[in-house]
Amino acid sequence: MASQTSAPAEPAPMPSPEAKTTEGASSYDQADMETKHAGSPCPPKQKSWLARHFSLLLRRDRQAQKAGQLFSGLLALNVVFLGGAFICSMIFNKVSVTLGDVWILLAALKVLSLLWLLYYTVGTTRKPHAVLYRDPHAGPIWVRGSLVLFGSCTVCLNIFRMGYDVSHIHCKSEVELIFPAIEIVFMIIQTWVLWRHCKDCVQVQTNFTRCGLMLTLATNLLMWVLAVTNDSMHREIEAELDALMEKFSGNGTNTCMCLNTTVCEVFRKGYLMLYPFSTEYCLICCAVLFVMWKNVSRSLAAHTGAHPNRSPFRLHGTIFGPLLGLLALVAGVCVFVLFQIEASGPDIARQYFTLYYAFYVAVLPTMSLACLAGTAIHGLEERELDTLKNPTRSLDVVLLMGAALGQMGIAYFSIVAIVATQPHELLNQLILAYSLLLILQHITQNLFIIEGLHRRPLWEPAVSGVMEKQDVELPRRGSLRELGQDLRRASRAYIHSFSHLNWKRRMLKEISLFLILCNITLWMMPAFGIHPEFENGLEKDFYGYRTWFTIVNFGLPLGVFYRMHSVGGLVEVYLGA
């Protein structure tokens, strides 16, 4: 060893003239290449045959996907236009096109959609490599729960309808019993399929699957349109019959009387009470089917294929938000019960309208201030924006903005009617304030929810940071003690940053819980009760009976859907805070 150390160092080999020439040439070539690169653009590097062939296949696959989406979208558009033409013809020309004709068309569409749903479950999903990925963001539990709840209510609605038709079987056609039976079977199977497969990203039979999804979506959309228009016609006919009965009381006989008055009253009240849920069920099915259509042939990364880690739903010490929300809920239930009791009589006293609108005027500005405070806290946070492509979140935003147009449209029509007639009366001033505050509350709440949905959850960066640190440092450090010390240091740093953001998290959770309870209250009142927008008579006298009925019956279901969808979005904001 000593001899090896004391030995003289070997002299470095001298480069040969050829090597010098080669080295000089290479340096000259390199300088020349740099000059060419700086002066003029280099010619593109030629790709290999495999890379060119692979990119060509990818391009053809994208073109095939776009063609399939275009064709299925056109199919749905034509079906909706055909059904819309039938429904409009039924409204404006009741002699040539009757309600029975529309039912026949919808029954044919339901049977076709039913056959596709069964084939999708039995055939498509059981093929090899059919469902390689499942979208973790699609079909959250509140959407599937609402699907089952509203689907069950709609099935009960059709049972009440069949019972009512059976009690009048002596003056009604027996064929009319077939349509509710088909709808019951269709809704049961559709709810079951959507519950099981709403997260699927199908990779086989993509074009056929897209067409089936669009056909089912168009069928649900036409069911919603018919439910809204048929409800308005039913209310109009009922109001006209009541007026005729008051005018000609005791004169004439009704040939279609129920044989058992008590049973018919149960069927009629059950049908009227459950009717709003059918419109909500159709809207939710359309949203779920659209997400499934967007997920056809979609490929997800390995880490997004599984269910992401989610923060559990805990109160985290929130006090004021739940208390204020429960206070609004109790007050809303009291106002709702008083108004419903008064509405069961022949006329509603003016003071109950004042109480109803005064409750809204008190709650809506509080919700708007809470939304503005939450949006400001989002701006103060250090969380990054989540810019990844997410079809479910994009659909949530579109549905949130679109559903808000329902009640906002009614509010704008009310503002015009009040300002143009008698804006100085107390009730009219309350309705005017209610309409303005409703528009403001929708805008601020949409801003708060959309801002929260596009923020990364607070727990996500810490978990991923610790995992990346483990992956990087594990091969480098051999001591488990040093690794434990690093993990403890990372935990202390996370706890320190958590304590600094704690007040923001708590404020966001307080605001989210308060808004959740308020939206539940504002969802319950129009969904289960009488609509003051029609009963107060102001807008009805200004726009006319048929026009205002159409506006209300198209706007209110969207408003109910907006409140329910807002609750789901606020739950996501609460969990991500």
From Swiss-Prot:
Residues 1-46 are annotated as: Disordered. Residues 91-100, 163-174, 230-276, 340-353, 417-427, 529-547 are extracellular. One of its GO terms (molecular function) is identical protein binding. Activated by extracellular acidification. Activated by Zn(2+) under non-acidic conditions. Changing residue 234 to A: Reduced efficacy of Zn(2+) to potentiate proton channel activity. Residues 1-69, 125-140, 199-206, 294-319, 377-394, 451-510, 571-577 are cytoplasmic. Expressed in epidermis, small intestine, stomach and retina. It is a multi-pass membrane protein. It is found in: Cell membrane. InterPro entries: Otopetrin. GO terms for biological process: proton transmembrane transport. Its main location: membrane. It catalyses: H(+)(in) = H(+)(out). GO terms for cellular component: membrane; plasma membrane. It holds the Pfam family Otopetrin. The keyword Cell membrane applies. Keywords: Cell membrane, Hydrogen ion transport, Ion channel, Ion transport, Membrane, Transmembrane, Transmembrane helix, Transport. The keyword Lipid metabolism does not apply. The chain crosses the membrane at residues 70-90, 101-124, 141-162, 175-198, 207-229, 277-293, 320-339, 354-376, 395-416, 428-450, 511-528, 548-570. Homodimer. Proton-selective channel gated by extracellular protons. Belongs to the otopetrin family. This is Proton channel OTOP3. The gene is Otop3.
